[in-house]
Amino acid sequence: MALKERLGTVVSDKMDKTVVVAVENRFPHPIYQKTVSRTTRYKAHDAGNTCRIGDRVRITETRPISRSKRWTVAEVLSHSPKAQEVST
């Protein structure tokens, strides 16, 4: 079985080794056919505490790590401009 992958934006990094990633899902409304966007928030494991708020990341499904974590950060696609300013 293939592992699920999602692309999203980090919206919280306050927890140790955990980030909250918001993934936007767009789909047509079944009756009115208007494009509807729904945001789902996933808690993902960030082993190195490398992600910051605003980063674009790819998360993959994994074994349950805790009660609410079933995803892990596979890679950071782009860092947010704010995170780059703070680190320099």
Curated annotation (Swiss-Prot):
GO terms for biological process: translation. PROSITE patterns: RIBOSOMAL_S17. GO terms for molecular function: rRNA binding; structural constituent of ribosome. The keyword rRNA-binding applies. One of its GO terms (cellular component) is cytosolic small ribosomal subunit. The keyword Magnesium does not apply. Keywords: Ribonucleoprotein, Ribosomal protein, RNA-binding, rRNA-binding. Belongs to the universal ribosomal protein uS17 family. One of the primary rRNA binding proteins, it binds specifically to the 5'-end of 16S ribosomal RNA. HAMAP family: Ribosomal_uS17_B. Part of the 30S ribosomal subunit. PANTHER family: 40S RIBOSOMAL PROTEIN S11 FAMILY MEMBER, SMALL RIBOSOMAL SUBUNIT PROTEIN US17M. This is Small ribosomal subunit protein uS17. It comes from Prochlorococcus marinus (strain MIT 9303). The lineage of its organism: Bacteria, Bacillati, Cyanobacteriota, Cyanophyceae, Synechococcales.
